[in-house]
């Protein structure tokens, strides 16, 4: 019976400390947030687990633009983009995003999606259906993995960050169309893919690169244009996917690529064609977000975030060495503190929450077995005092955890 089967599966997850449960935020996304049950009095917590890297999710100007967009366009789009749901706000947003990516991708055109998951599925299923072979980085995000599976294409995986191994796979391939698929900033480790080396390999073997810059767009680069600006890359072989619900603070995602590729997606990508367009108000708000990211305020926020990252890493390095944990090789706002054991990661997360600090414990299958961790993420809305409090609280919790484990 289905219910009995599912109950056994749930019991197995519980036994392995793998059960996931949702939490309810009663206030806006911000470092200081109230969290609790739907009818219970919420608890104020200092949070280090959102992807709101620039602190724009609760920005007054963006919230005002969202309300302005709703007043102008209404609450919803009413149809898919190819029927009647493609608004002026959507078109303006796509034009601005194409302008942002034009220095890095010749003849760039942009296409807006409701979510990053949809954008990744759209690109991989549409381009993968052309008889391509997909050469996928081993630590890609789940949406890229699912997209590759749904594409029903030949898929080959290369080890994390290993351009040499990728080169060998491409050299051995006889497929006419070769697509390299990689995250830019890896979501659970925070390190950056060696895109310059990957691009050299792509050019040598007449391949194309699909880059998911979910955690780089808005954060990396002098103007916040993302990983391509950060690394100084330019090529028509780049197919860029950016997320607008993380550093940009709103919702959605986009694909930027040579106009021929984008027109192909408009006409063949099922996740784009067969869904209702996002509310135009969201696109309208994103135009304000882009102005902030590229302006002086955005530069100031990125500079502040860089300082917080250095402060956190310096403190975590000491704590990890003392506790026998490890600190990931990340220079981004994603800082993994790798504890190892699932139960230990949950216990550390719970100990922090008991002191008023919320940090998520990440366990398999999201990360490999034996690498359970606290995924600490920073926002430009955090203060140096917030980071100091986190470090002090981890320092107090660590000895007790080791005592209980002994």
UniProtKB/Swiss-Prot annotation:
Reaction equation(s) it catalyzes: 6-carboxyhexanoyl-[ACP] + L-alanine + H(+) = (8S)-8-amino-7-oxononanoate + holo-[ACP] + CO2
Its annotated pathway reads: Cofactor biosynthesis; biotin biosynthesis
Keyword Nucleotide-binding found: no
Report the protein's function.
Answer: Catalyzes the decarboxylative condensation of pimeloyl-[acyl-carrier protein] and L-alanine to produce 8-amino-7-oxononanoate (AON), [acyl-carrier protein], and carbon dioxide.
What is this protein's record name?
Answer: 8-amino-7-oxononanoate synthase
UniProt family annotation: Belongs to the class-II pyridoxal-phosphate-dependent aminotransferase family. BioF subfamily.
Q: What class of enzyme is it?
A: transferase
Is Transferase one of the keywords? yes
Q: Give me the gene this protein comes from.
A: bioF
**Species of provenance:** Cupriavidus metallidurans (strain ATCC 43123 / DSM 2839 / NBRC 102507 / CH34) (Ralstonia metallidurans)
């Amino acid at each position: 019976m289905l219910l009995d089967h599912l109950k056994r599966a749930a019991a197995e997850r519980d036994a392995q400390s793998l059960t996931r449960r949702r939490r309810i935020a009663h206030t806006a996304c911000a470092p200081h947030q109230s969290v609790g049950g739907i009818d219970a009095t919420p608890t104020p917590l200092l949070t280090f687990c959102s992807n709101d890297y620039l602190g724009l999710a609760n920005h007054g100007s963006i919230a005002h633009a969202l309300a302005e967009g709703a007043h102008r366009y209404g609450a919803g789009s009413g149809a898919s983009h190819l029927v009647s749901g493609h608004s002026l706000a959507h078109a303006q947003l796509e034009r601005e995003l194409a302008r942002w990516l034009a220095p890095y991708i010749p003849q760039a055109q942009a296409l807006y999606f409701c979510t990053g998951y949809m954008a990744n599925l759209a690109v991989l299923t549409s381009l993968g259906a052309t008889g391509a072979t997909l050469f996928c980085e081993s630590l890609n995000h789940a949406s890229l993995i699912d997209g590759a599976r749904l594409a029903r294409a030949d898929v080959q995986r290369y080890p994390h960050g290993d351009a040499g191994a990728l080169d060998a796979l491409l050299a051995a391939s006889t497929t006419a169309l070769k697509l390299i698929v990689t995250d830019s900033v890896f979501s659970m480790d925070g390190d950056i893919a060696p895109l310059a080396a990957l691009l050299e390999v792509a050019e040598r073997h007449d391949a194309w690169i699909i880059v998911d810059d979910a955690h780089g767009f808005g954060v990396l680069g002098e103007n916040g244009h993302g990983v391509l600006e950060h690394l100084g890359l330019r090529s028509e072989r780049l197919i860029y996917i950016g997320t607008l619900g993380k550093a940009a603070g709103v919702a959605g995602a986009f694909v930027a690529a040579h106009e021929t590729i984008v027109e192909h997606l408009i006409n063949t990508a099922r996740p784009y064609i067969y869904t209702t367009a996002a509310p135009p108000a969201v696109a309208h708000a994103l135009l304000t977000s882009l102005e902030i990211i590229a302006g002086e305020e955005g530069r100031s926020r990125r500079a502040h975030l860089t300082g917080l990252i250095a402060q956190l890493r310096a403190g975590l390095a000491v704590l990890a060495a003392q506790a026998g944990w490890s600190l990931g090789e990340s220079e981004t706002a994603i800082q993994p503190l790798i504890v190892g054991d699932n139960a230990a990661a949950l216990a550390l997360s719970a100990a922090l929450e008991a002191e008023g600090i919320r940090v998520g414990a990440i366990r398999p299958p999201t990360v490999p077995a034996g690498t359970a961790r606290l995924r600490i993420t920073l926002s430009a809305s955090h203060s140096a005092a917030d980071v100091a409090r986190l470090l002090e609280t981890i320092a107090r919790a660590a000895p007790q955890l080791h005592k209980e484990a002994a």
